[in-house]
Each structure stands twice: as structure tokens, then as C-alpha cells.
Amino acid sequence: MKVLAITGYKPFELGIFKQDDKALYYIKKAIKNRLIAFLDEGLEWILISGQLGVELWAAEAAYDLQEEYPDLKVAVITPFYEQEKNWKEPNKEQYEAVLAQADYEASLTHRPYESPLQFKQKNQFFIDKSDGLLLLYDPEKEGSPKYMLGTAEKRREQDGYPIYFITMDDLRVTVEEDSY
């Protein structure tokens, strides 16, 4: 697998409202652990849309790993121009910091937000252009990642497209391992 799309919950879906929330350490650690396994198997790129939450945290985790894995690249392909336009300032700063370090950055539709169709097009593009999907998602705690997951499941039915999860149980294990 060369290209891995990553998505997951937005911060509010996880009850995270501050960028210094202790939970972020464990979320990023769980993401890093999964990325390292993929890197050892030949992963070259992670693909995110720059969405707040898991996607930006995954990019930050990837940037941390680039010291040890300098060939790992991050692509940020937004569904439309200025997706951060109405975000709060700390969120904009985090987003801009992620974009500044990205190896590739583009906007899929080359227009500002017009309709939910742009998100659907983004999901399809990500699944079409990647070799697998990693989600921080628990099907028992439904949230925004369900749309990308649905697109991935349709492709999996056609060609076996791999879908990987980081679940709430995985996060608990990460916390427990760190406690020893």
C-alpha cells in the first residue's frame, strides 16, 4: 500500500474542545502506531482533506514520524476553497500549520463551498485515489466518518479495498500500554 486515506471524528464528536486535551496524546500515539506498521510495509503518502479532528491530528502525527521516516509524504486535498473560512482562530492556526508542512496541497473543486455534493465528491476521490482507508471510528458511535466509510465499503465490495479502524477499544489499549 502506497497511499493511505485517513479520516475520523471531528473534535466535538469526541468531546475534545481544547488543543491541549490529554486525549490528543493518545489519539496521535494510536495513529502513529498504525502508520509505523504501514510504513514498514511500504506506505509513502497519507491523504487527508484537512478536516478538523482526526485528519489534522493524523497529519501532525505523520510530521512527527518524518524524522524517522523521511520518505513519508502528506497530501492535503480539500473538498473546496476556504474550508477554514468560518473556523475559530485556534483551529485556523492548526490548519494553516498543517498546510504549511504538507508535501502536496490542492482543492478538489477549485470553488468555495456550494453544496454537500462537494463532500460526496471528495469522499469518492479519496477512495478512488488511495490504496486503503484508516478511520478512527467506532460503528457503535456513529458520526461524520460514516460517509467516507460508506464510499469505501462500496469499493471494497468491488475489489477488496482495505479498510482499517482505530476504535475506542484501541485507544483504551494505547492508554493502558502507556500506563505501564
Swiss-Prot record:
Name of this protein: UPF0398 protein YpsA
Gene behind the chain: ypsA
Membership in a protein family: Belongs to the UPF0398 family.
Domain of life the protein comes from: Bacteria
InterPro entries: YspA (IPR010697)
